[in-house]
Amino acid sequence: MSQHILKNTIEDLELVRSKSPLVHNITNYVVMNNTANALLAIGASPIMAHAIEEVEEMVTICSATVINIGTLSEPWIQSMEKAAKKAVSLGKPLVLDPVGAGASNIRNAAIRRILDAGNPTIVRGNASEILSTLSSSGKTKGVDATDSSESAVETGKSLSKVTGGVVVISGATDFILKGTDMAQISNGDALMTKVTGLGCTASALCGAFAAVQKDQFRAATSAMAVMGIAGEMAKSKTASPGSFQVAFLDALYELNADTIKQKLNAK
């Protein structure tokens, strides 16, 4: 286990809880409630706002913005472009979750437009989404990964060079990449794939940690460590997806330094 990542994760979790950062989310209908509750459970303060008339104001008052393209329409894409441009102009953390990248032309176009508006400090997705974000060669099965996280590492490194930011590839092992830096988090549980929106939750947590930790690589690594450990804690209480969702929120709320020390599997 990496003692460096262990120390950082404990410190960054305390920062989130002590500062309770406002995190602006333009996210999808499917996960809004779960995402907001997860942010509250970890100690952050969520704002869920997508109206184009107010996104610039929301970006301005919040400490980070998370853009999630799960349920798209043209007005939403315009809001995302506007929010991305504003976040970059203010030098604030911007997280992009390219949900279902490669599944449709509108998703691919939306990703290009958002990237043109402003490079995110963190991009988080599964292997297929990361592959398709950089090129059209990845194949997407709905919004679930059909590629292993390992298979997307080189593409993730290339995407990091394009954006100048961090790329997180979620999977059985999570890879966090920026330039020549790479961290691996091997926590979590397979039951997490049976609850919709936990990938979206991971992106929101990246936003919360990025809001309080200037080192975006460190912030993303800490967020993914917390995500995986909370998943293991939830699985220890239930073996079914319905109760797992509730147990996961409880785990985020109850997570402490001792549990992180016991469970973290990172390098």
From Swiss-Prot:
Residues binding substrate, per UniProt: M48, G197
Name the record gives this protein: Hydroxyethylthiazole kinase
Similarity comment: family membership: Belongs to the Thz kinase family.
Top-level division of the source organism's lineage: Bacteria
InterPro entries registered for this protein in UniProt: Hyethyz_kinase (IPR000417), Ribokinase-like (IPR029056)
Catalytically driven reaction(s): 5-(2-hydroxyethyl)-4-methylthiazole + ATP = 4-methyl-5-(2-phosphooxyethyl)-thiazole + ADP + H(+)
Keywords, in A-Z order: ATP-binding, Kinase, Magnesium, Metal-binding, Nucleotide-binding, Thiamine biosynthesis, Transferase
Organism in which the protein naturally occurs: Leptospira biflexa serovar Patoc (strain Patoc 1 / ATCC 23582 / Paris)
